[in-house]
Each structure stands twice: as structure tokens, then as C-alpha cells.
Amino acid sequence: MNLSRQEQHTLHVLAKGRRIAHVRDSSGRVTSVECYSREGLLLTDCTLAVFKKLKTKKLIKSVNGQPYRINTTELNKVRAQLDNR
């Protein structure tokens, strides 16, 4: 599966247990998204366009209106990324 660098970075952050908070308008469409890292910092790579691509590819999902998280079946497909800590 071909993923852009921003999509990969967003998936790696989500794989560490983080979430994508979303805001919907009156018609139910997602108008803005914010992806938070483990430390609670805002991830700038996660834009509305990246969010829509990940959702279209069914890599992320939301259950009962909760924040979007990585799909459990896709969690195993994400390659490990070195964490420089």
C-alpha cells in the first residue's frame, strides 16, 4: 500500500495509542481535525486532506462518535519506526 510521508507519520503516532479529534458541522461532515501525540502535543502533519485519505483507505475508524483511532487490523501492518528518545 502506498502511503505518503505525512500519512505514515500520522499512522505511527496513532499506533502509539493516540487519537484524532474531529469537529463536525450541522450536516455531519468533518470540518477540522487535530491529531495529538503521546505527550499531548498537536501533530502538524495531520491535516484534513491526510485524514480523508486515511479514512478512505479504511486505516482509521471511529466507534460511537469517539475520536478516530487506528484500525486494529491495520495496526499490525504499520512498520516499526525508531523513536529517538
UniProtKB/Swiss-Prot annotation:
Top-level taxon in the UniProt lineage: Bacteria
An MF annotation (GO) of this entry: DNA topoisomerase binding
Alphabetical list of InterPro entries matching this protein: YjhX_toxin
Disulfide cross-links: none
Family: Belongs to the UPF0386 family.
Entry protein name: UPF0386 protein YjhX
